């Protein structure tokens, strides 16, 4: 239930803010705004459909819904943070004007450029994160301790963090992590 409360907060607080700012940035053409509106309607519908019918839906369907909604949840956090940075920049402009004249003269184009910059930036970040999860790296760290440990001169330790094991990071991926861990031959 705690996870639902967290994600419902994101759905009901972050999505309207992202929608409002994105809608303002898009040109007032139906060809631009209708797909944007549909994206938010479909995502919200999918989220509530998955939540309401989570006990009745087959696992493969609910896991697919979780992949989509969890990905959007994380992306919406990054998008909101980006938008808040832009809000601070905009606030600084109101306090002490510093934007170049060409930017003020082409404000709609500037907003559209920032819209796509955020979309592509967050998309790139999400792709990189997915790649990192699917292809974990082994990093060797050598630590010298000033104390003697009996007759041992070395110790191999394997550490993994931030796995977030659940429906999305499931059994297959965990087995991959365990195999990678065992390949290091820990003591």
What kind of feature is each model-predicted range?
Residues 1-134:
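Non-catalytic terminal accessory segments
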Residues 133-187:
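Membrane-embedded segments
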């Amino acid at each position: 239930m705690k996870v639902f409360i967290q994600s419902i907060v994101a759905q009901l607080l972050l999505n309207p803010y992202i929608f409002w700012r994105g809608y303002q940035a898009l040109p007032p053409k139906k060809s631009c705004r209708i797909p944007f509106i549909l994206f938010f309607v479909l995502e919200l519908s999918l989220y509530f459909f998955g939540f309401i019918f989570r006990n009745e839906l087959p696992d493969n369907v609910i896991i697919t819904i979780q992949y989509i909604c969890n990905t959007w949840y994380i992306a919406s956090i990054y998008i909101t943070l980006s938008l808040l940075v832009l809000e601070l920049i905009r606030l600084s402009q109101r306090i002490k004007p510093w934007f170049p004249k060409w930017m003020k003269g082409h404000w709609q184009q500037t907003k559209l450029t920032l819209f796509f910059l955020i979309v592509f930036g967050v998309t790139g970040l999400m792709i990189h994160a997915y790649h990192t999860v699917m292809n974990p790296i082994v990093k060797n760290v050598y630590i010298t301790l000033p104390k003697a440990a009996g007759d041992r001169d070395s110790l191999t330790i394997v550490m993994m963090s931030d796995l977030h094991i659940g429906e999305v990071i499931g059994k297959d991926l965990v087995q991959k992590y365990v195999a990678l861990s065992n390949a290091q031959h820990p003591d």
